[in-house]
């Protein structure tokens, strides 16, 4: 008896040549339904329609086509089970040897912001049922859920009967496929109706296997959503991205996004930002009226740490900027756009990774962030709310000057992306010193202030958390700091305020903390 293949696909990529090969080279009969049957018939592929096979018409606007004992009995029957084979004969069923199914494009529809009713109609029922039936009975039935599997299947049946390992692998991929599909539906309803799931379910397709993780002895894989974020970034040149590159690129981009992000070169003057990042911490940042001047100012903060670092811009990178960058050893440069002349200059640094990530490639909604822990995972909202100044209060007798206020805003945005305890010293819209990841705030302050004094005197100071004591203010005064910005909220806030007043320092409370671990 000829093998029977059940074919029902939404993604019709390569389905015609695949089915022709099955029929002409391997003697398969094709069983199909709905649009797939019509599509194959038009291509002159002989097809038996499901409605004729089951002797039951499609009903309920096509909602019920393949949900029938003649379909699922033919898939689920175990060939080695005598009772199953007796029932197959008794009920005049035919065994189905291959199931080729992919599902309604639910993800694509909801990404297009379609109405609720249209999204519901794109929830596939019959497709997942056939896939799961075939995957369960994978000892006897092969199941294909992706056009990329077709050629491999042809190569395998050329060799003879399919191996147990091959069919098990197909079943594994099938269950992955249906699990991903169900998670997409669940997560969409959760977001649409603001429902908090009792189980965390998320599905990310494999992007690629990385050479290694943070260290060479650690294996690493990259999973992600298609056509968004780093998965959609265009790598214009350079070596393959590493695990550490991706982490640092993410941190650098999140920092530079604080100042806007424009694909076109005509971003407003005085708001072109450059951020240099190393080991997930900014080591220099600046905003000015050009990418080149912003980078040069950012580099002044810590040129030693910038060696082998990551640079992110929020605007076009031109020839002048590229000429400066090429003389420094950097791992990656990311920006929304690059001049042709800049890219030609970068070609002289063949190992430099240059990435173009346009504004359109960025996520359009607030995301969550997560951290693995033993036996679980922690999930929280991303700390990416706009820095509203409505809650800011000047708590000292002296108010910041106009320039100090601009510098405080700048330093506060950078401080948010520095590992806690974090202190940033800034002046004239550029960082002078950054104290990152210290176990006490005074220690972070000493690092930032000592670094700053090597570049310029004075400036403003930002802290990601409140001052538990007045010692940070006392230290800041010794280094000529004229204004401070911090969340406030300590039971000893008054001590810090009095210390500021006695030293002629202005201070703002933001009433928002930005710890980062």
Curated annotation (Swiss-Prot):
GO terms under biological process: 'de novo' IMP biosynthetic process
Source organism, top-level taxon: Bacteria
Residues in MGS-like domain copies: 1-145
Alphabetized UniProt keyword annotations: Hydrolase, Multifunctional enzyme, Purine biosynthesis, Transferase
Pathway membership, UniProt: Purine metabolism; IMP biosynthesis via de novo pathway; 5-formamido-1-(5-phospho-D-ribosyl)imidazole-4-carboxamide from 5-amino-1-(5-phospho-D-ribosyl)imidazole-4-carboxamide (10-formyl THF route): step 1/1; Purine metabolism; IMP biosynthesis via de novo pathway; IMP from 5-formamido-1-(5-phospho-D-ribosyl)imidazole-4-carboxamide: step 1/1
Gene3D superfamilies reported in the protein's UniProt record: 3.40.140.20, Methylglyoxal synthase-like domain
GO cellular component: cytosol
SUPFAM superfamilies: Cytidine deaminase-like (SSF53927), Methylglyoxal synthase-like (SSF52335)
Enzyme Commission number, as recorded: 2.1.2.3, 3.5.4.10
InterPro entries: AICAR_Tfase_dup_dom_sf, Cytidine_deaminase-like, MGS-like_dom, MGS-like_dom_sf, PurH-like
A Pfam short name: MGS
Domain-level remarks: The IMP cyclohydrolase activity resides in the N-terminal region.
Organism expressing this protein natively: Prochlorococcus marinus (strain MIT 9515)
Any one GO molecular-function label of the UniProt entry: phosphoribosylaminoimidazolecarboxamide formyltransferase activity
Recorded catalytic activity of this chain's protein: (6R)-10-formyltetrahydrofolate + 5-amino-1-(5-phospho-beta-D-ribosyl)imidazole-4-carboxamide = 5-formamido-1-(5-phospho-D-ribosyl)imidazole-4-carboxamide + (6S)-5,6,7,8-tetrahydrofolate; IMP + H2O = 5-formamido-1-(5-phospho-D-ribosyl)imidazole-4-carboxamide
HAMAP family assigned to the protein according to its UniProt record, in alphabetical order: PurH (MF_00139)
Membership in a protein family: Belongs to the PurH family.
Protein's name according to its UniProt entry: Bifunctional purine biosynthesis protein PurH
């Amino acid at each position: 008896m000829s093998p029977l293949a059940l074919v029902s696909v939404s993604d019709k990529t390569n389905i015609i040549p695949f089915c022709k090969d099955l029929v002409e080279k391997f003697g398969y009969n094709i069983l199909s339904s709905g649009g797939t049957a019509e599509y194959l018939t038009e291509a002159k592929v002989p097809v038996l329609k499901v409605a004729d096979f089951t002797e039951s018409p499609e009903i309920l606007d096509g909602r019920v086509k393949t949900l029938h004992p003649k379909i699922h009995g033919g898939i689920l029957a175990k060939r080695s089970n005598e009772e199953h084979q007796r029932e197959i004969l008794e009920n005049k069923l035919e065994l189905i040897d291959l199931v080729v199914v992919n599902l309604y494009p639910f993800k694509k529809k909801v990404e297009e912001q379609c109405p609720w009713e249209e999204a519901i109609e794109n929830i596939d029922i019959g497709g997942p049922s056939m896939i799961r039936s075939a995957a369960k009975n994978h000892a006897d039935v092969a199941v294909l859920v992706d056009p990329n599997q077709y050629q491999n299947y042809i190569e395998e049946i050329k060799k003879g009967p399919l191996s147990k390992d091959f069919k098990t692998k197909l079943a594994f991929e099938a269950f992955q496929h249906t699990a991903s599909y169900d998670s997409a539906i669940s997560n969409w309803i959760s977001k649409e109706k603001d429902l908090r799931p009792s189980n965390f379910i998320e599905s990310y397709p494999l992007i690629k296997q990385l050479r290694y993780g943070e260290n060479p002895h650690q294996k690493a894989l990259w999973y992600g959503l298609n056509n968004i974020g780093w998965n959609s970034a265009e790598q214009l040149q350079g070596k393959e991205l590493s695990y550490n590159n991706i982490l640092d690129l993410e941190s650098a981009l999140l920092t530079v996004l604080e100042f806007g992000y424009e694909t076109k070169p005509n971003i407003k003057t005085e708001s072109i930002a450059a951020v240099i990042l190393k080991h997930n911490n900014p080591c220099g940042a600046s905003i000015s009226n050009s990418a080149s001047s912003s980078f040069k100012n950012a580099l002044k903060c810590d040129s030693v740490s910038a060696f082998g670092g990551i640079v992110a811009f929020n605007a076009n990178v031109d020839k002048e900027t590229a000429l400066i960058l090429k003389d420094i050893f950097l791992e990656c440069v990311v920006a929304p756009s690059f001049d042709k002349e800049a890219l030609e200059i970068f070609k002289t640094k063949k190992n430099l990774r240059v990435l173009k990530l346009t504004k359109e490639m960025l996520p359009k909604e607030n995301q969550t962030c997560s951290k693995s822990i033993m036996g679980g995972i922690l999930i929280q909202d991303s700390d990416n709310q706009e820095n509203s100044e409505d809650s800011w209060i000047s708590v000292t007798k002296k108010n910041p000057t106009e320039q100090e206020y601009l510098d405080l805003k700048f330093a506060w945005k950078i401080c948010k992306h520095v590992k806690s305890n974090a202190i940033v010293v800034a002046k004239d819209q550029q960082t002078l010193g950054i104290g990152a990841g210290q176990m006490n705030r005074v220690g972070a302050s000493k690092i930032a202030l000592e670094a700053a004094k090597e570049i310029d005197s004075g400036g403003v100071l930002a802290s990601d958390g409140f001052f538990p004591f007045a010692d940070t203010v006392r230290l800041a005064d010794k280094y000529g700091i004229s204004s401070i910005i911090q969340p406030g909220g300590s039971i000893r806030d008054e001590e810090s305020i009095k210390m500021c007043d006695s030293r002629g320092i202005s201070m703002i409370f933001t009433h928002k903390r930005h710890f980062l671990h």
